[in-house]
Regions:
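Low-complexity, Ser/Thr/Pro/Gly-rich disordered linker/stalk regions
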Residues: 18, 27-211, 215-298
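N-terminal secretory signal peptides and thylakoid transit peptides that target proteins
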Residues: 1-16
């Protein structure tokens, strides 16, 4: 049995035993000021304002290690027991009315909402990874103009307007947009100003219903544009982009999961209109497609 197969079997065993979110773990260029995806978050290398949350480290499991730099809001993330018919624990992230990016907290005095953490692969960086998790927006969730959801990352230039140059970073978070439309929001060497929109509207999130989202990121061979991103929702492929450039050096690899979720956008026009929340569960990382039955309303 291969090492990859052993890892996948171990993850399946942990999840089946109720160990919560057991985890290891159309294209448009970026916008100018004031556009939807503008994304000025806390600097990646800034010290965390709170210590690493032990309750979340336990939730994510031994294969993902919460880094002490670049985190915020972890003290507000609650771990919830498995509900009837679901069989997994979840975490709840709250978005207070008026909250948006961390810049809006510092600049506009807005309430802080959402949460962010860098979850490093304990067994080291990779070049071809599947990340799967479940997300559920509360019943009646008001998507407003949009917000961020977790994805994969490598390096330091992954958010906040730090456009990567092929040697220092990339990321592939998701966004929800108006009406619940989904997309990949990627920081790439080809991005301008901020991130790059991929696949806007190729799927939609439905409030009150769990969705299983899975992305596969395969890094390019340095010197070639042969990387790719594929997205599945509830087991169905909804987006694929080949011929991608993530890096120009083999030293840049996929380091972990960028757990990042908040409303925004860089100003209060992106703020959450009401107090609301989203739930996340079953974070799994593998070197192959991750089978996960749709959860629906459980």
């Amino acid at each position: 049995m291969s090492a990859g197969s052993r890892r996948s079997l171990l993850l399946a065993a942990l999840l089946g035993a109720g160990v919560g979110a057991g985890a290891l773990a159309g294209c448009a260029s970026g916008p100018r000021h004031g556009d939807p995806e503008r994304d000025p978050e806390v600097p990646l290398l800034a010290p965390a304002t709170t210590p690493v949350a032990p309750h979340l480290q336990s939730f994510f499991g031994p294969g993902l290690v919460i880094r002490r730099h670049g985190s915020y809001g972890l003290e507000r993330v609650a771990v919830r027991p498995a509900s009837a018919g679901c069989g997994w624990r979840s975490i709840r992230v709250r978005y207070p009315a008026g909250s948006a990016s961390q810049l809006s907290v510092e600049r506009d005095g807005a309430p802080s909402g959402g949460a962010q953490a860098y979850l490093l692969f304990r067994d080291g960086p990779r070049e071809d990874v599947h990340l799967s998790y479940r997300v559920r927006f509360q019943e009646g969730f008001q998507f407003a103009r949009g917000g961020k959801l977790p994805g994969l990352f490598g390096g330091d230039h992954v958010a906040g307007g730090h456009t990567p140059d092929g040697t220092n970073g990339f990321s592939t978070r998701y966004m929800w947009r108006a009406g619940g439309k989904g997309q990949v929001y990627a920081y790439l060497p080809t991005s301008t100003d901020y991130g790059t929109t991929l696949g806007l509207g190729t799927w939609e999130f439905v409030p009150g219903r769990w969705a299983v989202v899975q992305q596969r990121v395969r890094l390019n061979t340095p010197g070639l544009a042969d990387g790719s991103v594929v997205v599945w929702v509830d087991g169905h492929e909804v987006f694929r982009r080949d011929g991608m450039l993530f890096r120009t050096t083999p030293a840049l690899r996929i380091e972990g999961v960028f757990f990042s979720t908040f409303f925004g956008g860089d100003d209060l026009s992106w703020a959450s209109p009401i107090n609301q929340y989203a739930d996340f569960a079953t974070f799994v990382v593998s070197d192959r497609f991750i089978e996960a039955a749709p959860a629906g309303l459980c």
